A protein has these predicted regions:
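Short acidic, S/G/P-rich loop/turn micro-motifs used as interaction or catalytic elements
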Residues: 32-33, 80-82, 103-108, 145-149, ...
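Short, flexible boundary segments at extreme N-termini or domain junctions of P-loop NTPases and their
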Residues: 1-25, 173, 188, 204
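Canonical P-loop GTPase G-domain recognition
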Residues: 147-206
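Conserved beta-strand/loop subsegment of P-loop NTPase cores
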Residues: 96-99, 128-146, 176-186
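Substrate-engagement module of ASCE P-loop NTPases
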Residues: 120-131, 167-175
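Switch I (effector-binding) loop of TRAFAC-class P-loop GTPase G-domains
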Residues: 42-72, 81-83
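Glycine-rich phosphate-binding P-loop
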Residues: 22-45
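Inter-motif core of Ras-like GTPase G domains
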Residues: 84-110, 122-130
Length: 206
């Protein structure tokens, strides 16, 4: 019975986009690369040089090789605290959330990140006053690792990076988060065509 309850709980949160995914939401901390990721998914060459405040993302075809899938219209919002209330508008049934975190600012943004993660999962589970959301998924995408490596004068294996993020945010102590949070952390260079293709393929081949 306990195993079934755990399975039902984790069913709220897919590890990657699934056939039930209808929308993509890219959220996160200021400067983590949200607009850069949207540009990469849309094959736009614009480089994010200023802070995004709020702009509409029109429906578009996400393409990778010969494969493609329609991505529903949504919004690209800023990463400041002012924009957190917009999460309620962007996360609906069937939404997969990519939450972007700049590995170089984890310590200074720790409290803000933890608060936002708690809000997202409470929304999905219906513990923030709403009805809850069905068929949603979630992943933390760790960005700017190249700068992190340069600052630390060495590279880290992926597993060590994930541990650094998980421990730095103390994910295990955030009430309401799935127990498998370590499996939901991925690293990515948003300026790398290969890494963008990996994300595209993950969304397309769901």
């Amino acid at each position: 019975m306990i195993d079934l309850l755990i399975y039902a709980l984790l069913g709220y949160f897919f590890l990657k986009p699934s056939k039930k995914t209808k929308k993509i939401a890219i959220l996160g901390i200021k400067g983590a690369g949200k607009t850069t990721l949207w540009n990469g998914l849309r094959d736009e060459s614009d480089v994010e040089t200023v802070t995004t405040h709020y702009q509409k993302i029109e429906e578009f075809s996400l393409k990778s090789g010969k494969d493609e899938v329609k991505i529903a219209s949504t919004k690209d919002i800023g990463g400041g605290d002012y924009y957190v209330p917009y999460y309620d508008e962007l996360i609906e049934d069937g939404t997969f959330v990519y939450f972007l975190v700049d590995i170089n600012t984890i310590k200074e943004n720790k409290d803000a990140i933890r608060m936002r993660l708690r809000k997202i999962f409470n929304m999905i589970k219906g513990e923030s006053g709403g009805a809850g959301k069905k068929d949603c998924g979630f992943k933390i995408l760790v960005t700017h690792t190249d700068v992190f490596f340069n600052n630390n004068l060495k590279r880290m294996p992926k597993a060590q990076l994930i541990e650094y993020v998980s421990d730095g945010l103390e994910l295990a102590t955030i009430k309401g988060l799935p127990r498998d949070m370590a499996k939901r952390i991925e690293t990515g260079n948003l300026n790398s065509p290969n890494d963008i293709k990996t994300i595209k393929d993950e969304i397309i081949h769901r």
